[in-house]
Amino acid sequence: MATKIRLRRMGAKKNPFYRLIVADSNAPRDGRFIEEIGFYDPTKQPEVLNIDEEKAMKWLATGAQPSDTAKSLLRKAGVLAKYHESKK
């Protein structure tokens, strides 16, 4: 089972917020997921980003591939830098 770290859209029309989830790569965007590892609210000022680093590191270590947007959010939170440091 190939897993992806990606965003799940939540909220009302024209007022989105996103949950960062781990899901099977074949599952639909807002469908079934394995675990929630954080959330992102771009509508707040400043933007709210909360990621459980421990869960994210665990899933990255097991081979979950982040989507492009999820990768940029993980980089913004400093999780990717810590992951690459732990691999060395």
Swiss-Prot record:
Superkingdom is: Bacteria
Annotated Gene Ontology cellular components are: cytoplasm; small ribosomal subunit
**A Pfam family for this UniProt protein?**
Ribosomal_S16
The answer, when asked if Ribosomal protein is one of the entry's keywords, is: yes
> What molecular function does GO assign, one term?
structural constituent of ribosome
Q: Which GO terms describe its biological process?
A: translation
Q: Does the keyword Protein biosynthesis apply?
A: no
Keywords from the UniProt entry? Ribonucleoprotein, Ribosomal protein
Name the HAMAP family for this protein: Ribosomal_bS16 (MF_00385)
Protein family membership: Belongs to the bacterial ribosomal protein bS16 family.
Matching entries from PANTHER family are given as: 30S RIBOSOMAL PROTEIN S16 (PTHR12919), SMALL RIBOSOMAL SUBUNIT PROTEIN BS16M (PTHR12919:SF20)
Name assigned to this protein: Small ribosomal subunit protein bS16
